[in-house]
Structure formats: C-alpha cells, structure tokens
Regions:
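Local cysteine-cluster metal-coordination motifs and their immediate loop/turn environment
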Residues: 1
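Conserved AdoMet/S-adenosylmethionine-binding subsite of the radical SAM
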Residues: 8-142
Length: 142
C-alpha cells in the first residue's frame, strides 16, 4: 500500500508536469498558466472506493494542510468506514437506483446485505457536518 504522503506528492508532481506542457501554447494566457500551478481541488472518485483506502483520513488531512479541498465520492457500501471518515470538503453518495432490486441489477454489489449497507450510509449523512450531496444516476429501467 502506498503511503498517503507519496500519493499526494505524486499527484501534485504529475499535475505540475501536465501544466508545464502548456507553456507557450498559443492562446494560453500567462496568468492562467501560472494559476494552473495552484491546485485548489482534489476529487476522490472513479478509482475504486476511496474510503476503503486505510489512510484516507491522513490523505485528506494532507490535502487540507496544503489548502486543497477534498471531494469524496462513495458508493455507500461501507458504513463502518464512513463512520470513521473525518470531514472532507464535500461528501458525495452515488445513488445509482431507487429500489433494492434495481440497485442489485445496476451495481452488482459484492455483499448480500448491500441494501442495508446503502441505507445505513444514507442515514449517516444526516449526522455529518460537511456539505453532502446525493449524486443521482438516471437511466431507463432495463
């Protein structure tokens, strides 16, 4: 498992490397180029379930120490980890379906108690102090 310090620094270095490639590109304003070096936000999603990373709290603390906001997206399947998650800038729960059967079909969950886990995570949102968001997935019934 990679340590959070290495992940944060690696992500920042990769970001800087990409921004440097824009130097001298026609249409890129110098002030915008410089602004690109000041990372302000980090979205933790689309790379698996971020709250399953054992060092997620340290990772987000490192971001916050650097003045970087943290946007974390969870699939609402890990209520115990959600209880121990320290505040992030904004916490999203993906709502991929509105019924147990639809959620099973859409997400193909690994745990038999997926619906109970899902509803438990939703209930926990009411106890959290940071901004929270339901991220809805809309689609036709199949």
């Amino acid at each position: 498992m990679d340590p959070p310090e290495m992940l944060v620094e690696g992500a920042l270095q990769n970001h800087y490397k990409m921004i440097k490639q824009m130097r001298g590109v026609p249409g890129v304003l110098p002030e915008r180029f410089e602004e690109g070096f000041h990372v302000r936000h980090c979205a933790l999603s689309l790379v698996g379930e971020p709250i399953m990373y054992p060092e997620i709290n340290t990772f987000t603390e490192l971001l916050h120490e650097k003045g970087i906001s943290s946007y974390l997206v969870t699939n609402a399947q890990f209520p115990e980890e959600m209880k121990t998650l320290k505040p992030v800038t904004q916490l999203y729960i993906s709502i991929d379906a509105s019924t147990k059967d639809a959620l099973k079909a859409v997400d193909r969950p690994l745990n038999r108690d997926f619906w109970e886990r899902f509803t438990s995570c939703i209930e926990q949102l009411a106890l959290r102090l940071e901004r929270t968001v339901f991220r809805l997935t809309l689609g036709r019934i199949f």
